Amino acid sequence: MATKGGTVKAASGFNAMEDAQTLRKAMKGLGTDEDAIISVLAYRNTAQRQEIRTAYKSTIGRDLIDDLKSELSGNFEQVIVGMMTPTVLYDVQELRRAMKGAGTDEGCLIEILASRTPEEIRRISQTYQQQYGRSLEDDIRSDTSFMFQRVLVSLSAGGRDEGNYLDDALVRQDAQDLYEAGEKKWGTDEVKFLTVLCSRNRNHLLHVFDEYKRISQKDIEQSIKSETSGSFEDALLAIVKCMRNKSAYFAEKLYKSMKGLGTDDNTLIRVMVSRAEIDMLDIRAHFKRLYGKSLYSFIKGDTSGDYRKVLLVLCGGDD
């Protein structure tokens, strides 16, 4: 996949001490200068933001995130604090938020676990344990059930084959197994779907999807929709979409977070913050292709104030 990359790049002529002073000035005394905060943090990459946090602590003797939390509020605060949080820790905190308290944010669990690389997932698991003194797998088990639980536990192990190796015989076997597990029989053997979709490498799976279509005359997505349901179906579809095209998957997540009445701010914020440095330009291109309007125009119409301002900077421009 040729990628255009992210919208947030390392700022040239970067000076962490200077930025720290600008931020302190923006928050000192009465009122807060939100524009100054955006002008610094939205135009620095994650590594630079961490340097600013260190400089802030060493020159001012206060924690930057604590100060931002006490000065800001609502969705704008959530974006800024998200941007200030190291990448892996941000995912960890989002997973914890998705499972804490009453109710579960299944969409968040699926999105993170289906889209991150096996290596990222292993780092997420380790960091989760360090942060909360409990294992990610145990929390998933206590918060979910049935096949949905099994697919998340499987993804959270980070055991997917990371190679590119292709075995034609296994491709045919997997496609046949999936066909026999679903379309060909009454009832569905969900475990077979789980085994193939959670453990094989991307190159292998793309060939399996092609072979599956050849023998069943259907896209694997169509079969998943007719053979499974609920959160388990959502998880399997997310895996397939991420394997086919991760940026298109995130474009769809953003579209669904804003279309219709109301906004799913948690999803909108998480995707904008976590993809800004990785593939936001690709996400924008897919958004325009899929929905005929720019991501920029959607954000503009769906948000307001400083929250809108900072998201538009992360979006990086209109298409």
Swiss-Prot record:
Residue spans of the Annexin repeats: 14-85, 86-157, 169-241, 245-316
Phosphothreonine: modified positions: 7
Keyword field contains Phosphoprotein: yes
Record bears the keyword Lipid biosynthesis: no
Lineage: superkingdom: Eukaryota
Keyword annotations of the record: Acetylation, Annexin, Calcium, Calcium/phospholipid-binding, Cytoplasmic vesicle, Membrane, Phosphoprotein, Repeat
Cellular location(s): Zymogen granule membrane
Chain positions with N-acetylalanine modification: 2
Spans traversing the lipid bilayer: none
Any one annotated GO CC term: zymogen granule membrane
GO MF term (any one): calcium ion binding
Note: Seems to bind one calcium ion with high affinity.
UniProt function note: Calcium/phospholipid-binding protein which promotes membrane fusion and is involved in exocytosis.
Protein name: Annexin A4
Species lineage: Eukaryota, Metazoa, Chordata, Craniata, Vertebrata
